[in-house]
Regions:
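Positively charged n-region of N-terminal signal peptides that target proteins for export
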Residues: 1-4
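Bacterial N-terminal signal peptides
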Residues: 7-17
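N-terminal helix-rich structural modules
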Residues: 22-184, 202, 496, 503-506, ...
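C-terminal, non-catalytic "cap/extension" segments appended to globular domains
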Residues: 23-30, 64, 200-203, 269-284, ...
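Active-site-proximal, well-structured secondary-structure segments within enzyme catalytic domains
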Residues: 145-148, 157, 184-354, 424-432, ...
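Active-site scaffold of zinc-dependent metalloenzymes
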Residues: 162-169, 333-360, 367, 371-378
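Post-HEXXH active-site segment of zinc metalloproteases
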Residues: 202-203, 207, 377-403
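Post-HExxH zinc-binding segment in Zn-dependent metallohydrolases
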Residues: 216, 220-230, 390-427
Length: 599
């Protein structure tokens, strides 16, 4: 199989549509023939790349890194040449389907390689090495060697500011060796993007949303302005509670928050410090962590429970191969990429997840989220190859998050027997606080990661100022500062997986808006009359049919058309976030009276 795929690649690199060689204006028929050939060749090659990547992610060695780099390098070269050829059909009066495929072909690669010998292989080597350096990162603390998982546990559980600072700095130190590779990667990726007609890689990324690149940047600004006041309200309250806990010497009552005090390595979700910021005079009658343990859940049962949710809304159970081939727990005998992800290895039925699952509420949610990717992948499996994707990358993230909103409700926990009785309305504020500490706290981080990369790719920020620019944006959007002065050669962006892993991040910001819009629409469809945060769509098969109809469209239509199939709306509307959290935002406004909010 491998030799056949490589042979097909060699043919593909030499055999483009004849119109290009003739120099005459291509015809619509030639454009369609070109697209058909490109799809066939890319589909044939995709399985080889996917399986090489899976092996490397689940068994990190020099050999598997070499294999993945070779496969992705060959794919990058193939796609880059096809993408450049696609540009030659600009202006040809093709049918709408062919036109969309030509556009998607030019946008296929996250980071296209320059069209010159050796460039694709070099880019693939850099991206594989950065990912592996991050994934195998370790540091010393109190005579012990700590992994990211170890460090995350300490940040979640410790309330010793000195320990938090030391562990935070320890993990961030692993990113320093990544910087030289990132500098080279950014330059190569930009060269490739410019070869396809984009100003830089950032402009290429922003062109993936069925609108002009600059219009998309403005759209994310619009959405951020809709939710920013709520974030600032939450920030103000949390900062006050941290000040009560630690005092002025650690966390002042005004200004930004120290990033290591929020229970998460990147301060992107703050739910782990709920014990510090819990609304006074309120109680939570249950802990999802404790419920899972008490009911005898293990990682496999958690995934089975996630599957059951999707089955309850009418989706076909996962294939047997999913259970045989997925990595559900962390192996003890080798290095793996623990970052949770969902995989489609053959564009048909070989779907899998890769997780180092722990029995806790966070991973209970993550399971429902990752399975959302798998069910989306399977829903669009009958689409042509270039349409086998989400309506946009934010949709792909939002599908599982939408299900996750139901999965965390006491309504659902009672439906599946984890909770004997749903709590009363007096527990709504603590429930919404827990949700906001994860969902609302995330929003500015979801925005700023790519804001930083856009500045890097555009040349606005040069390598000497990478770290300074990173913290300038973290202060601007999140109101956060590091726990101490950062070394001049630090590369703190590299301590977040998606930077060395080369995964665009604005998708997560969008997903955190879309999921509430989907949730509100679904709850209206099922006739839910209560507060949005109590609504569960578990068991709602009619709603599931409408939902799956959107998923089956893949990337075949612009995302507004696909969104309308399920929600009836063609624009992104963050008012659903406000609707969901309205009781908490009103409560926070009262609590913050007299505080000097902002930073």
């Amino acid at each position: 199989m491998k030799s056949q795929l490589l042979a097909a690649t060699a043919v593909a690199l030499l055999a483009f549509a004849p119109a290009a060689a003739q120099g005459a204006k291509p015809t619509p028929a030639e454009a369609k023939a070109f697209v058909d050939k490109a799809e066939a060749d890319l589909a044939a090659f995709n399985q080889y790349v996917a399986k090489s990547s899976w092996v490397r992610a689940t068994y990190i060695t020099e050999d598997t890194q070499w294999l993945e780099a070779k496969a992705t390098g060959e794919q990058n070269e193939l796609v880059t040449r096809y993408a450049m050829e696609a540009a030659k059909y600009d202006g040809v009066a093709v049918d709408p389907v062919t036109a969309r495929k030509l556009k998607l072909l030019k946008l296929y690669l996250v980071s296209p390689a320059p069209n010159r010998p050796g460039a694709a292989a070099e880019l693939a080597t850099l991206t594989t090495r950065m990912d592996s350096t991050y994934s195998s990162g370790k540091f010393q603390y109190k005579g012990k060697t700590l992994t990211l998982n170890d460090a995350e546990d300490i940040l979640a559980e410790s309330r010793d500011p000195a320990e938090l600072k030391a562990v935070w700095e320890g993990w961030h130190s692993i990113a320093k060796p990544i910087k030289p590779d990132y500098v080279k990667f950014a330059a190569l990726s930009n060269e490739g993007a410019r070869g396809l007609g984009f100003k830089d890689t950032g402009a290429l990324w922003r062109s993936n949303y069925d609108m002009d690149a600059d219009a998309f940047a403005a759209e994310t600004d619009r959405l951020w302005k809709q939710v920013e006041p709520f974030y600032r309200n939450l920030h103000c309250y949390v900062r006050g509670q941290l000040n009560d806990k630690y005092g002025d010497a650690v966390q002042k009552r005004t200004g930004p928050i120290r990033a290591d005090l929020l229970g998460n390595m990147w301060a992107q979700q703050w739910g782990n410090v709920y014990d510090v910021v819990q609304p006074k005079g309120t109680t939570s009658s249950y802990s999802l962590d404790k419920l899972l343990t008490a009911k005898g859940y293990d990682p496999l049962k958690m995934v089975k429970t996630g599957e059951n949710f999707y089955s309850s809304i009418g989706m076909t159970p996962l294939p047997e191969t999913f259970w045989k081939r997925s990595m559900i727990t962390r192996p003890q005998d080798r290095e793996v990429v623990c970052h949770a992800s969902a995989w489609d290895l053959d564009d048909r039925d070989d779907i899998r997840i890769k997780m180092c699952t722990k029995v806790n509420g966070e991973d209970f949610y993550t399971v429902h989220h990752e399975l959302g990717h798998n069910y989306y992948q399977r829903a669009y499996k009958d689409q042509p190859f270039l349409f086998k994707n989400g309506a946009n990358d934010g949709f792909h993230e939002a599908i599982g998050d939408f299900v996750g909103l139901s999965a965390l409700t006491p309504t659902y926990l009672q439906q599946i027997g984890l909770l004997d009785k749903a709590p009363g309305a007096d527990e709504d504020i603590p429930f919404l606080m827990k949700m906001a500490l994860d969902k609302i706290a995330f929003l500015p981080f979801g925005l700023m990661v790519d804001r930083w990369r856009w500045e890097v790719f555009s040349g606005e920020v040069n390598p000497e100022h990478y770290n300074e620019a990173w913290w300038k944006l973290r202060l601007k959007y999140q109101g956060l500062v590091p726990p101490g002065d950062r070394p001049a050669d630090a590369f703190d962006p590299g301590a977040k997986y998606h930077v060395p892993g080369n995964t665009p991040y604005t998708r997560y910001f969008l997903a955190h808006i879309y999921q509430f819009q989907f949730h509100r629409a679904a709850c209206r469809q099922i006739g839910w009359k209560g507060p949005l945060h109590r609504c569960s769509v578990y068991g709602e098969k009619e709603m599931g049919k409408k939902f799956n109809a959107m998923l089956e469209m893949g990337a075949s239509k612009p995302w507004p058309e696909e969104m309308a199939v399920f929600t009836g709306e063609k624009t992104t509307d963050a008012s659903a976030v406000a609707d969901y959290f309205q009781p908490l935002n009103a409560w926070l406004t009262v609590q913050n009276k007299g505080e000097n909010c902002g930073w």
